[in-house]
Regions:
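Glycine-rich cofactor/substrate-binding loops
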Residues: 1-32, 36, 97-98, 264, ...
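A helix-coil-helix interface module used to build multimeric assemblies
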Residues: 1-201, 206-208, 274-275, 290, ...
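Short, well-ordered beta-strand elements within core beta-sheets of diverse protein domains
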Residues: 42-50, 119, 166, 235-243, ...
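Helix N-cap/coil-helix junction residues
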Residues: 49-50, 217, 377, 398
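Short linear loop/turn motifs
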Residues: 57-60, 225-230, 385-389, 424-427
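Charged, flexible cofactor/metal-binding loops and thiol motifs
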Residues: 116-124, 129, 143, 151, ...
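Charged/polar low-complexity intrinsically disordered segments
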Residues: 460-464
Length: 469
């Protein structure tokens, strides 16, 4: 028997019923469903809707169900329609008619919204912890790189010299934005929907403010119609996950390229690579490639969910059942991808000579133009002169390091005797002046700030930093 069988003369068609069953995946909400029901029973008792003995029996029954489910996941099984039906069935089996009173004044429409909010509230911090661990790995690599140099790239063409540490901290910076996006999604879940009923509210004098405090919510939803269909918090979570996966995909792409033989700036650890069944020499970046591939999966969950939401009329619709599979899959995808990325990044070896060699040559052209500009030449004119120098050097198979002082001065009388010494990768990074630049002092300050940010998380989330590892 279903929770809604009273209206119907016949049993549901098995195919139609099975099509709507969600217990196969929403059992993940077991703990949240029981937690919400415990609070609801308490609220019903507090306003006199439940007799004290019934409230006590329900509480005892739900606590025993929760204990059994935590002890043995196989306990959470059956032919039930959804997790709500399962919990109610188990409760009635244990406490009889008192269990049939639990759903007084409550709809599954608000119940499932509550469950999913509770679920995300406890699961988002775990994803944030994994993000912080990866950020820590990048900070550790930045510290280990010290003042090593590498080329930066635009259009996948060498652009300007940067510190390797600056490159690592660039990825840490993007991941910190992902941490904040997930925090924004967590804040968005922080509203109690109970008291909304199916759509119009409940006729029982439930103290929703007290109920919100009991469940750890900072506020109650504003409108019962909106609450019954609101899954904006799901979209926000999926967006946060998708952006994190986009950044992980870009990280993966960078290291797939930079660990390849043609670049060789970094070496993958044997423990975070795979081989070939045919080619003995191969060392493949499979974990990185899978992270890159799974980003499309997460993005698909976001776009699919937005497409589901876009045409729904006001109030609850069964389409909203699709939210849970999107959430669960996106969460698993990000969690596993963060674990894999951490395994790779934390074990990377810098091949400093290869990286430094690639950071010299013609990518110093901007610094040469800046040299002229600092000495009074308009930048656009300096750009033209240096461009002509580059054209000549390419034709001759040379770079700036091969120019004699005479050749420098022939290119422009703005070049002084110090021009050859100024056109080096090390001078290039020291010439930068802004706080977000690759200047070594700026990078060291950025690393300290990143460490401070990570340390600030520890009291709340137990996120490890280098001191505790």
């Amino acid at each position: 028997m279903t929770l809604w069988s009273g209206r119907f003369d016949t049993e549901p068609d098995p195919a139609a019923f099975d099509f709507g069953v969600s217990f196969g995946f929403d059992r993940a909400l077991f703990e949240d469903d029981v937690t919400g029901s415990l609070a609801w029973a308490e609220a019903l008792g507090a306003c006199g809707v439940l007799a004290k003995e019934d409230a006590a029996a329900i509480r005892k029954g739900l606590e025993s169900i929760l204990e059994d489910g935590r002890r043995d996941p196989a306990f959470i099984t059956g032919a039930d329609e959804d997790i709500h039906s399962f919990v109610e069935r188990k409760l009635i089996e244990r406490v009889g008619d008192a269990g049939r009173r639990l759903h007084t004044g409550r709809s599954r429409n608000e119940q499932v919204s509550l469950d999913l909010r509770l679920y995300l509230r406890r699961r988002i911090p775990l994803l944030q912890q994994a993000l912080a661990q990866l950020i820590t790995a990048f900070a550790d690599q930045a510290e280990a790189a010290a003042d090593a140099l590498m080329p930066s790239y635009t259009h996948l063409r060498r652009a300007q010299p940067v510190l390797v540490a600056h490159f690592f901290l660039a990825h840490a910076s993007a991941l910190r934005r992902d941490f904040e996006k997930l925090e924004a999604a967590r804040v968005e879940t922080d509203a109690l929907p109970l008291g909304s009923g199916a759509i119009a509210g409940t006729g029982y004098p439930i103290d929703t403010a007290l109920l919100a405090r009991r469940l750890g919510f900072s506020r109650v939803v504003r409108n019962s119609i909106d609450a019954s269909s609101d899954r904006d918090f799901v979209a926000s979570f999926l967006f946060g996950v998708s952006m994190a996966m986009v950044h992980l995909s870009r990280i993966a792409e960078d290291f797939i390229i930079f660990t390849g033989e043609e670049y060789g700036f970094f070496e993958l650890a044997d423990a975070s690579a795979t081989g070939s069944s045919m080619m003995p020499q191969k060392k493949n970046p499979d974990p990185l490639e899978l992270v890159r591939g799974k980003s499309g999966r997460a993005i698909g969950r976001l776009t699919g969910w937005l497409a589901t939401m876009k045409a729904l009329p006001s109030g609850y619709n069964k389409d909203l059942q699709e939210d849970k599979e999107a959430v669960f899959d996106a969460e698993r995808t990000l969690a596993s991808s963060l674990t894999a990325a951490h395994a790779v990044v934390s074990r990377l070896t810098l091949r400093a000579t290869n990286a430094a060699d690639a950071a010299s040559g013609l990518l110093l052209a901007t610094d040469v133009a800046d040299y002229l500009t600092i000495r009074g030449m308009p930048f656009r004119r300096a750009h033209e002169i240096v461009g002509a120098m580059v054209r000549r050097l390419i034709a001759e198979g040379r770079d700036f390091s091969t120019l004699t002082l005479k050749e420098w001065k022939e290119a422009s009388d703005f070049f002084g005797d110090d021009a050859p010494q100024a056109a080096t990768a090390l001078e290039s990074v020291y010439a930068k002046r802004t706080p977000q630049s690759t200047n070594p002092d700026a990078v060291h300050a950025s690393l300290r700030e990143c460490r401070d940010w990570l340390d600030s998380l520890n009291p709340k989330s137990q996120i490890p930093n280098r001191k505790s590892q």
